[in-house]
Amino acid sequence: VKVAVTVDDFVLWDGVPMPDGITPLGITKSIAATLADHGLTGVYGFSHTHRLDSDPGLMAAWEAWVEAGHHLGNHTHLHAPLRWMSGDQYCADIDKAEGLIGNLIAMAPERYFRYAMDMAGETESKRGRVEDHLRASGYRNAPITAWFGDFTWIIPYYRAVVSKDEDAKRMLQETYVSSAVGQLAAHAQLARRLFGQDIPLIWLIHGTAIATDTLGTILNAFVKNGVEFVPLQEAMSHPAHFAMPPCNSEFLRNHLQRYAIAAGIPEPHLDPELFGRVITAAPVEGYDTVTVFEQRMLKPLAQRAGAAYDWTW
C-alpha cells in the first residue's frame, strides 16, 4: 500500500505537559532527521499557530521544518473543532494562521489545509462555508485516511518519563509501534472494502516525545510490511481525497472513518483493553490522562473559541 506521511502539531497544544529537556523545536528537528534517515523529504507538517501568541520564539520550529526540506500547511490558529465555531469564525481562524506562517506555507508546491482533529463539522452548510473559503484562499483540504489515536500515549509517556518507570516506558513504546502498524493495516483493509482497491493512504503522526523515540521503528516496520512512501501530492490525486464523506456528529473520526460510517461499515479503533492499559500506565498524582486533556487543553480551548464545552471520548 502507498502511504503519504504527514505530521501534525509539532508544536503541541497549550496545556500538554512535556518532560524536562523536551521542546517543540527539539521534537521538530528530531522528527525531521528521522524522516531524512528514511529518505523522506517534502513531508507536509500541519501545526496550529496559537502558541505563537504567547511565545513568538516558537516560530523557530516552523522554520526548522522548512529548513529540513519539508513543507507546511495551514491547520488553523486555535486548533478548535469546527463544531465549536461558526463557519465565519473558523474561516477567520484559518486566515489568522495564514497571517502568521503564510510566508512559509507559500514555499510548498501545493497549498494544503487540514481541519483541526480532522473534524470537518457537523453540518453540510457550515462545512460548505469553510470549503468555499478554502477554495477562495487557494487551499485544498488534506484529510487523514490512516491514524492510530497516537495522542492517547502523550500523557502516559510523560508520566513514565518523569517517574522513571522504565517498564511502563517500554510497554508504551512497544504498544505505540504495534498500534501504528496494526491500525495502518486496518485502515488499508477498510479502504479496500469501501473502494474495491488499495488507495494511497494519508497517515498522521503528531509531534510528541514518544514519536521522537519510536518513529524510526515505525517507518522500518511499515517498509517491512510492503509500504511504499509517496508524496502527499500523489496521495491527494486519488478521488477518495477529493470527495467529502457526509458530515456526522461523531468525535475524532477521520476522513476514511466517516466514509465507513456513511456506508454502515465498522470502522477501526484501538482495542479497548489496550486503550485502558495505555491511559492508566505509570500513574502520577494530578496527571490522569483524561483529566489533563480536558482540564488543561480542551476546556481552555473551548473558552478561547468562545464555545460551550462539548466533547465525547
Walk through the language-model features, giving the residues of each.
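Short, basic, helix/turn surface patches
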Residues: 71-74, 100-105, 165-184, 253-274, ...
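Non-cysteine beta-strand/loop elements that form the S-adenosyl-L-methionine
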Residues: 73-75, 139-144
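Alpha-helical scaffold elements lining the catalytic groove of polysaccharide deacetylases
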Residues: 17-18, 51-54, 66, 80-104, ...
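Short low-complexity, flexible loop/linker segments enriched in glycine and/or proline
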Residues: 58-61, 88-90, 156-160, 243-249
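C-terminal domain-boundary segment and adjacent tail
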Residues: 36-39, 142-143, 194-197, 205-313
